Amino acid sequence: MITNYIFVTGGVVSSLGKGIAAASLAAILEARSLKVTIMKLDPYINLDPGTISPKQHGEVFVTEDGAETDLDLGHYERFIRTKMTRHNNFTTGAIYSEVLQKERRGDYLGSTVQVIPHITNAIKERIVIAAQGYDVALVEIGGTVGDIESLPFLEAIRQMVTDVGRSHALYIHLTLLPYLTTAGEVKTKPTQHSVKELLSIGIQPDVLICRSDHEVPDHERSKIALFCNVEKKAVISLKDVDSIYKIPKILQSQGLDQYICDKFNLKCPKANLGQWEQVLYEECHCEGTVSIGMVGKYIELPDAYKSVIEALKHAGLKNRVKVNIQLIDAQELLTVGIEKLAGLNAILIPGGFGHRGIEGMIVAAQYARENRIPYLGICLGMQVALIEFARHVAGMEKANSTEFDPDARYPVIGLITEWQNEDGEIAVRSEKSNLGGTMRVGAQKCHLVKGSLTHQLYEKPIIIERHRHRYEVNNMILPIIEAAGLSVSGRSMDKKLVEIIELPHHPWFVACQFHPEFTSTPRDGHPLFIGFVKSALAHHQDSLK
């Protein structure tokens, strides 16, 4: 199988939405019965984003095979059916680490190790590995053209055209057309300079996707085509929209997918975007609104909870309601009080690390339990729910996690010291282990208790969900908590690790150690989130009576 490559770069400014544009294009190509994958090349020196602050970088998206990756991979999985793997995201740091290890082993036979060819060859090798078995591979280059950090990646994709042949490679450049209100027009000069910067590296873009808050007029498209040396039909206007799920239709309406198929000489049926039209129909036909409070640690940057926010929106689509998400700083619940929780139809506590804000989260979990408000706890959200229940129902005053209090009298949550990893080997950890690459991470099977709420939602006895954590429920103390009324509705396949807890006599109180948000999509939703939003709607309707 010959793989065709589409390289996506960005210019003028950052945060233009290269990931969304690439994912939307991939969705159209997939709808044409092509086998498609996407990868993200990040120019930072970290080995992976696993230890980068969510306030700086946004969420860490976890793949099925346990890779901690860029949040753009979440967009990829929400737009296409292909599951991402550790091969779909790598960084400058990972490339340099690999090359330096080879140098130490003597793999380069005494050669002087340089950016060209050693670093660029390593980049190309990884791209080819990730693209194997696919008709089309989209490669998004992180950063902005002109950044010094991106140069090795840009040089590598320049070389790849020669390696794979011009008929199997295509460059898309995403750029900004600012609109000047005083002049009443979009300005093309920044785009011209961005393309000029690319040309200086040796890359001539084949397609320009022009981002703007206004539609790009036909005469401006002609001007861009002339000065940037691209065909007019390859100048795509992509103005701001109120829903990212409209973008596949916008790109298709301008013939981008057909242009690419013609370039690659791909004979395939026209795209059937019926499923995306259904998503848009559901968005436009919401019959109500529910307010869900998300009590977190990193609310300054909503991207820190990107997949959770999207999963709530997906569940809203399936319930035909608009989900109004209120981001609540956990620490403020201690300083300002619980007034921020009043009027909510449901409460969600997402994942996180460290002790900051924990007591505020415990207050939120207690409020949801005592006021019979639907509650969904994810990862840390399950742990704080368990701590709260132990303290206030099971009589374990000052119960805590050893992450927050190593000397807790009742350590209801403790460090996982060993478990079986994806290779079947026993992984061992301690408090002194490195932070990076030392978690129980990736897809794990979970056995559900028949008759439980979770079992009713999933409608199957065994599920597979993705994890990312170091701490687990302490099985030595668990029987006391269960005797007080808490139910364990999901365990690992060896029955050693608690995965899901419920409160049977509460309208809807579910908390899980895994991250269900990573497998939610706009076309399918996710059972837990759909059930959660449905319960929020029921709570809202009851409050109106």
UniProtKB/Swiss-Prot annotation:
Disulfide bonds: none
Family statement: Belongs to the CTP synthase family.
Annotated binding of CTP, by residue: S14, D147, I148, E149, K187, T188, K189, P190, T191, Q192, K223
Any one GO molecular-function label of the UniProt entry: CTP synthase activity
Regulation: Allosterically activated by GTP, when glutamine is the substrate; GTP has no effect on the reaction when ammonia is the substrate. The allosteric effector GTP functions by stabilizing the protein conformation that binds the tetrahedral intermediate(s) formed during glutamine hydrolysis. Inhibited by the product CTP, via allosteric rather than competitive inhibition.
Binding-site residues, UTP: S14, K187, T188, K189, P190, T191, Q192, K223
Active site, per annotation: C379, H515, E517
Subunit details: Homotetramer.
Pathways involved: Pyrimidine metabolism; CTP biosynthesis via de novo pathway; CTP from UDP: step 2/2
Sequence positions that bind ATP: S15, L16, G17, K18, G19, I20, D72, K239, D240, V241
Its EC number(s): 6.3.4.2
Residue positions binding L-glutamine: G352, L380, G381, M382, Q383, E403, R470
Miscellaneous comment in the UniProt entry for this protein: CTPSs have evolved a hybrid strategy for distinguishing between UTP and CTP. The overlapping regions of the product feedback inhibitory and substrate sites recognize a common feature in both compounds, the triphosphate moiety. To differentiate isosteric substrate and product pyrimidine rings, an additional pocket far from the expected kinase/ligase catalytic site, specifically recognizes the cytosine and ribose portions of the product inhibitor.
Amidoligase domain: region residues: 1-266
Keywords annotated in UniProt: ATP-binding, Glutamine amidotransferase, Ligase, Magnesium, Metal-binding, Nucleotide-binding, Pyrimidine biosynthesis
Enzyme category, top tier: ligase
Role according to the record: Catalyzes the ATP-dependent amination of UTP to CTP with either L-glutamine or ammonia as the source of nitrogen. Regulates intracellular CTP levels through interactions with the four ribonucleotide triphosphates.
One GO cellular component term noted in the UniProt record for this chain: cytosol
Protein name (record): CTP synthase
